[in-house]
Regions:
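A short Gly-Trp-Pro
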Residues: 2-135
Length: 135
């Protein structure tokens, strides 16, 4: 799906989704409908439908965006250096279609409140970049 034209994506996505997924914008914090979602299921790429994250790896980071301590697997996302905004960050993209999802930070939980081990990672993902499928 990485070879799809921008015209294809403009027709498929809403205006906000296009800005975030294709132009690397960031949605307003605390505005996304999936931020407080507590249901069990899978979070998929809004653009192509590829599974990216699961509810059992989601946690409340207090940042205003859905946060996950790991992806569904190592092949579902691509990581790359992002030097925009005068700082170096790690961009998270869908491995299947190349759409921008958010950023990866090293300030995630080492230990979860329920006793599970975390990864120390925080995948900070735009809510509008995700489509949730309930289990």
């Amino acid at each position: 799906m990485k070879n799809k034209s921008e015209d294809f994506w403009k027709k498929k996505l809403t205006g906000e989704q296009y800005k975030v997924l294709r132009e690397k914008a960031t949605e307003t914090p605390f505005s996304g409908e999936l931020l407080n979602n507590k249901e069990k299921g899978v979070y998929k790429c809004m653009a192509c439908g590829s599974p990216l994250f699961t509810s059992d790896k989601k946690y409340d980071s207090g940042t205003g965006w859905p946060s996950f301590w790991n992806a569904i697997d190592d092949e579902s996302v691509e990581l790359s250096e992002d030097n925009s905004l005068g700082m170096t960050r790690v961009e998270v993209k869908c491995a299947n279609c190349g759409s921008h999802l958010g950023h990866l930070f090293d300030d995630g939980p080492e230990k979860m409140t329920d006793g599970r081990n975390g990864t120390g990672k925080r995948f900070c993902i735009n809510s509008c970049a995700l489509n949730f499928t309930k289990k």
